[in-house]
Amino acid sequence: MTPLCLNCSVLPGDLYPGGARNPMACNGSAARGHFDPEDLNLTDEALRLKYLGPQQTELFMPICATYLLIFVVGAVGNGLTCLVILRHKAMRTPTNYYLFSLAVSDLLVLLVGLPLELYEMWHNYPFLLGVGGCYFRTLLFEMVCLASVLNVTALSVERYVAVVHPLQARSMVTRAHVRRVLGAVWGLAMLCSLPNTSLHGIRQLHVPCRGPVPDSAVCMLVRPRALYNMVVQTTALLFFCLPMAIMSVLYLLIGLRLRRERLLLMQEAKGRGSAAARSRYTCRLQQHDRGRRQVTKMLFVLVVVFGICWAPFHADRVMWSVVSQWTDGLHLAFQHVHVISGIFFYLGSAANPVLYSLMSSRFRETFQEALCLGACCHRLRPRHSSHSLSRMTTGSTLCDVGSLGSWVHPLAGNDGPEAQQETDPS
């Protein structure tokens, strides 16, 4: 028996006896190919149970509790991310524009996709939203999947240009350029999600000489499965394996560049005259190096978490598309992969704000400010000017970024209208 693949937006076509009422005789060979003769005597409920399975997904309660926890953390975290970037001018950097776009994608998944999937797990059939709702559901999941990976890839390219090619970054890493890139990202994501969307539709169970079974409508694959297999495997290759390989190479090059620069700067510091001069120069270099290393480390961890969270999703879809003969062992393995892929799919949408809070002092500060409500909170928290958003501390009390802004943010203050922009979200 072929297992169901609900978060793949498909149901196996061989579970459905046909898309229209069979005009052949009730005991014809075509009818016997799909239904047992006993099916004519079964009630509608028994037919639905036989061919569609239980109406409520097994393990619904524990999965529901897990999803609700992810929903709360992700909705609050991504909402705060969007809020602080919109409210604080100092946070409207090219890098943070990508993070804003990623947060919007995650919010779409959590606020629209997750409740819809929870409802379907509670009530697997009938699908109540019609053909339009089926198209929307499939398009949403596919589009945010593609938009997320394109966002993270574009962000990695931006970080590579900023670190390895700083002169080109002055003209390329600007807010206007990022807005154009993000427009292209979402446009490409929607365009590339259309093939999978077009393969889906609404099907109902039909019994020969009896007609459609009430309340059996399901949003599922309605085109040849070979087309779906090709789309899924191509998507996994072009929108997961290839981007992960590109990002791995980019961050390797970034790491090598930062290491080489650090060694050169240390050698230059040793050539300074007095001990006091070497100390001051070393302090400035530490701040410059710390700022770039911190943001690069945060974005690298974001990419790693992204890969971990999305790998089960693609493994789930590819496994369903390549296996033609299902044994009990494969069926059991797929069920485990399917549950894990669903949890990690939504966990990936909730993890990013947690990473920002843990690894970025600037995001952590603005998150606390956004959550701090009331006069009492204002009295308790230290006063921060907008300039404090670009301050970082090190082990030395002699180092203060306030006087070294051009070192920590070499792209700031040189681009006319972009004079206030910074490339680091930390």
Swiss-Prot record:
Tissue specificity field: Expressed in greatest abundance in peripheral organs, particularly in elements of the gastrointestinal and urogenital systems with highest levels in testes. In central nervous system structures express levels are much lower than those seen in peripheral organs. Within the CNS, has been detected in highest abundance in the cerebellum, dorsal root ganglia, hippocampus, and spinal cord.
Coiled coil feature spans: none
Listed transmembrane segments: 66-86, 98-118, 139-161, 182-202, 236-256, 295-315, 339-359
GO biological process, one term: chloride transport
Main location: membrane
GO cellular component terms, A-Z: cilium; membrane; plasma membrane
One function term, GO molecular function aspect: neuromedin U binding
Residues of this chain annotated as glycosylated in UniProt: N7, N27, N41
Function: Receptor for the neuromedin-U and neuromedin-S neuropeptides.
Protein name per UniProt: Neuromedin-U receptor 1
Upper taxonomic lineage: Eukaryota, Metazoa, Chordata, Craniata, Vertebrata
Gene, per the UniProt record: NMUR1
